[in-house]
C-alpha cells in the first residue's frame, strides 16, 4: 500500500476517536484525563491493527491472492458499517458519544478513571483490528503501518478534545461519514487492483 493510502486508512480509523473526543470535551472531559485518553487511543490503534495484521499475514500465506480479496472486502465492509452507523445516528439524533458519556466519572457512570478511559479507547479501536486484518492480507510494512495508525489516531483524538468546545457536534457525524467513505473507496480500489 502506498503512503497516501496508509494515511487515508489511518485518518478513516481516527474519525471515531475524533468524534468521541469532541463529544467528551463538550461534556467536560478535560485536563490530565483527556490527554491520557488521547495517548491510550494511540496505543490501542497500534496494538489492535498489529494483532489484525499478523492474523491477516498468516491468512495471506495460507490463501495467497484470495486473502487479498478478503482483505479488500473487509475494508469495504468496515467502511459500509461506519456509513450505516453514521446514517442511523443522524436519523435517531443520537451518537456514540451520548452512549459513552455515562461512563465518565462524575456523570453517574459505573466505570471510573482509568477503566473508563480503557473502555472508551477500546470501543473506538475495534475497527482497527478488522482493518489491520484486511491490511495484513495484502502484506504491508508492519512497523510503519501500526505506528502511522497510532500516531494519527492519537493526533485526531487530541484535536477532537481541543476543538470539542468550539465545534460542537458539527463535525462528529460528518467525520464518521467521511471515514466510512474513505474505507469503502480504499477497499474497492484494492479489490480492483487484485
UniProtKB/Swiss-Prot annotation:
Q: Which UniProt keywords apply?
A: Cell membrane, Ion transport, Manganese, Membrane, Transmembrane, Transmembrane helix, Transport
Q: Kindly give the InterPro entries that the UniProt entry links to this protein.
A: Mntp/YtaF (IPR003810), Put_MntP (IPR022929)
Q: Would the keyword Ion transport be found if you checked this record's keyword annotation?
A: yes
What transmembrane ranges does the database entry give?
A: 6-26, 35-55, 66-86, 109-129, 142-162, 174-194
Q: Where in the cell is it found?
A: Cell membrane
Q: Identify the Pfam families for this entry.
A: Mntp
Membrane topology, as annotated: Multi-pass membrane protein
Q: Which GO terms describe its molecular function?
A: manganese ion transmembrane transporter activity
Q: Does the keyword Transmembrane helix apply?
A: yes
Superkingdom, according to UniProt?
A: Bacteria
Entry GO CC: plasma membrane
What is the protein's known function?
Answer: Probably functions as a manganese efflux pump.
Family membership: Belongs to the MntP (TC 9.B.29) family.
The protein's name in its UniProt record: Putative manganese efflux pump MntP
Q: What is the lineage of its organism?
A: Bacteria, Bacillati, Bacillota, Clostridia, Moorellales
